Amino acid sequence: MPFSHGQVDGWIRAFAAAIAENKEYLTELDSAIGDADHGINMNRGMQAVLGKLEGGSQGDVGALLKTVGMTLVSTVGGASGPLYGTLFLQMGSSAAGKPELSGEDWAAALAAGVAGVQRRGKAELGDKTMIDALVPAVEALRSSLAGGATGGEALHRSAEAARDGMTATIPLVARKGRASYLGERSANHQDPGATSSWLLLRTAEETLAATQSQQQQGT
């Protein structure tokens, strides 16, 4: 791969931009089965994160990820703050002290983050939550790397798996969170948390691809 401190910083900034761009869409999705605030809350949190980023190409990747997590916990309301905060905090713990992440490091960090979200939210595949996008993304990332894929290929497959998991939430009946109160009426709606999780994985792929392209042009 590898993912440098600067690239991780760029990924966080790209995710913030994607959340801002899709704020109304995420809130629209949430209005059907939730509190109609997912896009608003996530955008507020990610804008706060941008204010905490120091930039630079070098540093502790784990510390950077933990900063993101702590900021989200303190600024994002509803369930999203604790869940996304846990994701980044656990990723940060996995990546602690590392100036860059190999493909295997990235997969381990993401897996640790997703496991933390599952523990926190007590959600499983099929519950119509962000887990439906994140778990397939981790599995695709690991299997791709184990099969000899490049970092870019692995991230592409991971993002594709997250997208497929996101769309697979549409027919599901929610079993967790506010949406579960609707019972059968929660079906035929895409889960907003799974959607923002897809944006997280999509921007990871795009950030690495853009950086690799710039490096190739500079050689």
Regions found by a protein language model. Name each.
Residues M1-T219:
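N-terminal loops that bind phosphate or other acidic moieties
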